[in-house]
């Protein structure tokens, strides 16, 4: 059940398309009746049924679970956000932005945007959704006190103000034709003006919050006042966390839950061979990366970083760890198939001799090194760490692997040690990905890597209206990250979900498993 790989919007509404429209008409308007499809057309499916309750198990569940969009950082958080809140735009299966709470976006220069809101939309408590809610929801991410996970994205928002009863004018610091894509980011969903207590989950999404126990369970019931006619279909959804892959699979096949994510590639045959159950593969830009920070003098050495990259046996990872459900990576975050992928960048191969030379040069061979922290919650990271350990032993490199519990890993270990693994969900565009994870001042800059030329290219690419020039800029950024960056990205991993075949309407959106975390409003129960 494979779908097309994440193509960054290829075949959809590209930057060049946007600029052509601006040039031809003096004004670009993207809306439900215009160049972008209506939201529902992207998810057309036969004869949805109404009613029923399902339980869904996600691998990411901990006491850090949140209902505050600014604080969300896991797939489970994003699932909650799309259950209880709605964004101005929404991505479809081709990563083309669709209008959602916004009825249209208009601009003449990609810097000043007029956002027209849908009329008649209400929050779960009955309050109408208005311009003040949008202004607050976008601009709160700029406030350092909010500690937003998407502050680097929000820094682009120079000013937002209500300019009509259903209208917001958003002015950017510099032109960015990707704004419709950026507004689909999970953290940028719309909340009530002035909200600081998110415990009630008041939004205007397809489900209303019934109960929320961080690390245990989230229950939502259908919002009968949802603004999309006929949706959602289910009466109730319970989202639980089961970090152990085997336990999560057993919960599915025993009938305890009806949908799970992050299936171990070694278990795919068990799912497909069990009557009544099916596997959903979504090819994507998901990657698990080895993070090499500068906290340790040996790890800080560029020769150590490059040596570790050569130590990865990428083909072995693809076949043995991911069982073919991945494509080989090249230590930069743009996957093959993406329209800005740099195919001319030479692929780094497994080269133990070169790795040994570089690691010897860095003083790493025979030295006591900090352990590599890995967890089952970062797809394949434990297996990657063990394979690196085994490859290192052959050349005199002593690597220790610390298998950390998934509960609290992202709060207590990720980015907190010289050697850790990350697990990065795909982003809606190259700009969003590079801004959140590689810009020098990004909170999620995993390795703490800083490169002034990279930052300059990133900012220049946003306002570049010539798509060929922009592709060259993104290509140059990929070269810089691959050759000078401090993360090893050996593979891009398919999302693997398992589901009860009575659950219908489950599609693929390459930003994440479970339909890009947006399954809640799209699935129904054929009992």
Which residues make up each language-model segment?
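Structural transition elements
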Residues: 328-361, 376-381
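Extracytoplasmic/peripheral linker and loop segments enriched in polar/acidic and small residues
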Residues: 394, 398-409, 435-501, 527
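Surface-exposed binding/hinge segments that line
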Residues: 106, 150-192
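Ligand-site clamp/hinge motif
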Residues: 225-270, 390, 398-400
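Long beta-strand-rich cores associated with HINT superfamily self-processing modules
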Residues: 499-527
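N-terminal lobe/hinge region of extracytoplasmic solute-binding protein
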Residues: 57-109, 139, 202-204
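Gly/Pro-rich hinge or "lid" segments in bacterial periplasmic/extracellular proteins
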Residues: 92, 96, 175-176, 181-238, ...
């Amino acid at each position: 059940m494979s779908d097309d790989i994440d193509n960054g919007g290829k075949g959809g509404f590209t930057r060049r398309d946007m600029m052509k429209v601006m040039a031809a008409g003096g004004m670009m308007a993207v809306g439900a009746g215009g160049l972008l499809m209506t939201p529902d057309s992207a998810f057309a499916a036969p004869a949805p049924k109404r009613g029923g309750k399902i339980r869904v198990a996600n691998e990411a569940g901990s006491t850090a679970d949140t209902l505050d969009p600014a604080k969300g950082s896991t797939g489970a958080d994003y699932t909650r956000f799309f259950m209880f809140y709605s964004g101005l735009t929404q991505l479809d299966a081709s990563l083309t932005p669709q209008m959602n709470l916004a009825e249209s976006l208009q601009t003449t220069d990609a810097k000043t945007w007029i956002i027209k809101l849908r009329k008649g939309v209400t929050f779960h408590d009955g309050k109408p959704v208005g311009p003040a809610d949008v202004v607050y929801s976008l601009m709160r991410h700029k406030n350092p006190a909010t500690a937003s996970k998407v502050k680097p994205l929000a820094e682009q928002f120079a000013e937002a103000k209500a300019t009509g009863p259903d209208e917001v004018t958003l002015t950017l610091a510099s032109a960015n034709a990707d704004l419709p894509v950026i507004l689909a980011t999970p953290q940028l969903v719309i909340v009530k003006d002035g909200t600081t207590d998110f415990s009630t989950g008041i939004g205007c999404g397809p489900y209303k919050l019934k109960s929320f126990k961080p690390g245990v369970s989230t229950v939502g019931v259908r919002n009968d006042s949802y603004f999309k006619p006929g949706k959602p279909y289910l009466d109730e959804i319970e989202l639980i966390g089961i970090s152990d892959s085997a336990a999560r699979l057993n919960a599915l096949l025993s009938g305890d839950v009806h949908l799970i994510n992050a299936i171990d590639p070694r278990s795919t045959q068990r799912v497909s061979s069990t009557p009544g159950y099916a596997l959903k593969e979504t090819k994507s830009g998901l990657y698990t990366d080895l993070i090499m920070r500068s906290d340790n003098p040996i790890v800080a050495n560029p020769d150590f970083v490059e040596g570790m990259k050569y130590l990865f046996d990428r083909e072995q990872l693809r076949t043995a760890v991911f069982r073919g459900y991945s494509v080989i990576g090249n230590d930069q975050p743009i996957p093959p198939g993406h329209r800005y992928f740099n195919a001319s960048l030479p692929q780094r191969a497994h080269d133990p001799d070169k790795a040994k030379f570089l690691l010897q040069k860095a003083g790493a061979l025979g030295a006591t090194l900090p352990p590599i922290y890995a967890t089952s919650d970062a797809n394949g990271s434990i297996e990657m760490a063990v394979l690196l350990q085994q490859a290192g032993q052959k050349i005199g490199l002593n690597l220790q692997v610390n298998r950390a519990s998934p509960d609290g890993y992202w709060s207590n270990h990720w980015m907190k040690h010289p050697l850790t693994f990350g697990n990065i969900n795909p982003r809606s565009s190259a700009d969003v990905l590079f801004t959140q994870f590689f810009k020098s001042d990004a909170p999620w800059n995993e390795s703490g890597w800083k490169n002034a030329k990279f930052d300059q290219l990133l900012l220049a690419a946003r306002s570049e209206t010539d798509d060929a020039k922009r592709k060259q800029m993104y290509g140059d950024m990929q070269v810089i990250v691959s050759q000078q960056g401090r993360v090893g990205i050996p593979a891009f991993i398919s999302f693997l979900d398992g589901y009860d075949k009575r659950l219908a309407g489950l599609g693929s959106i390459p930003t994440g498993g479970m339909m890009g975390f947006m399954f809640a409003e799209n699935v129904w129960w054929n009992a």
